[in-house]
Amino acid sequence: RVQRLKEGYTILPTMQKLAAFLNSDSDKNLPFVTDLGWLMASEVIASGLDISFAPVLDLDDSRSSVIGDRSIGDNPDQVIAIASAFIKGMNQAGMQATGKHFPGHGGIFADSHLTFSQDTRSLSELESHDLRPFDALKLQLGGIMTAHISFSNIDKEIVTFSKFWLQ
């Protein structure tokens, strides 16, 4: 869905299509995901770039028009397993991964680049669902990209400017 570099690059499946393929026998298919992470990172590095803002760690709760099929899925354990394999491939190619969109953009419909976006879920709801991939993968990530969302029951500031979320 969002692959900025196209001409001369391998067109990769969306993460959701990849996850659907993997559901048939995910443990045996994870090395394929590692290979895709390596392939993407290798091609980007070969073109002189040293970063890719991947992978998307948002959970797809079928509410977000922005995240959609860029998400691996709605199951935190599946997202963790597939993202970890993809990150491993990126790292093997020599690229750090950037997990996005912390702490999770999958629960709202609006495009936070175009309009103010607010999520009213509690911290405990986020901790048991959306935050799980970020927490599980934090030591594998070179960085995170924040969501431009206000989680108004936690902090009125959007995450990008929130001391609560950034510290």
Cite the ranges covered by each PLM segment.
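Enzymes and membrane/adaptor proteins characterized by extended Gly/Ser/Thr/Asp/Glu-rich
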Residues: 1-79, 106-119, 147-156
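Second-shell residues forming the walls of enzyme active-site clefts
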Residues: 78-167
